[in-house]
């Protein structure tokens, strides 16, 4: 999903999708970077249900000065570097998507 008003994109992957399409560990490596190739997208997120634990794995990437690390720390119990960060969410994938969408609107407010 693309959020043009926030120059952002979101990719999600559920356990069911991983089972249905026979995903193996490592198959999603680099997936979070793909939306950054789209014109106007400077921030990308990948939310994936963990295959072993009841949590959501969060990968964040950006271009330019968008602070992935601050976004990860504030909303997803994570951290990292300016343009590459990660975290986790203890809840459902749908809840994590809602948090992400609300965070996009809130994060860049003055």
Show which residues each predicted segment covers.
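Hydrophobic helix-and-loop "lid/oligomerization" segment in the mid-to-C-terminal part
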Residues: 1-75, 80-110
